[in-house]
Amino acid sequence: MIQMQSYLGVADNSGAKEVMCIKVLGGSKRRYASIGDVIKVTVKEAIPRGKVKKGEVYDAVVVRTRSGVRRPDGSLIRFDGNAAVLLNNKQEPIGTRVFGPVTRELRSEKLMKIVSLAPEVL
């Protein structure tokens, strides 16, 4: 569960290392985001000569959370940390690679690019 002020790692090669959630998108009173949800983030830590700079604001899709996601068969998929993939204005990934596993819950039409770039789909 990601909320405002939550820090997330970045699971792509866009140049950002850490981002902070500044808004959960999808309704005025929406408080929490989970895997597959789009959030508005600001870059808190970035590498030199990357595609993004510290302080810039982007959309991002949550790909891993510590709280995990419950499957219909009752199993729970959990991760060691929270991570997101940065998106541009057209909702396409900024980076060309995705690091670490992602879940099958991302397999919607608009997020298939992230699933295809990921090394492992759980």
Swiss-Prot record:
SMART domains: Ribosomal_L14. One of its GO terms (biological process) is translation. It comes from the Bacteria. GO terms for molecular function: large ribosomal subunit rRNA binding; structural constituent of ribosome. Keywords: Ribonucleoprotein, Ribosomal protein, RNA-binding, rRNA-binding. GO terms for cellular component: cytosolic large ribosomal subunit. Signal peptide: none annotated. Binds to 23S rRNA. Forms part of two intersubunit bridges in the 70S ribosome. Part of the 50S ribosomal subunit. Forms a cluster with proteins L3 and L19. In the 70S ribosome, L14 and L19 interact and together make contacts with the 16S rRNA in bridges B5 and B8. Belongs to the universal ribosomal protein uL14 family. This is Large ribosomal subunit protein uL14. It comes from Xylella fastidiosa (strain Temecula1 / ATCC 700964). The gene is rplN.
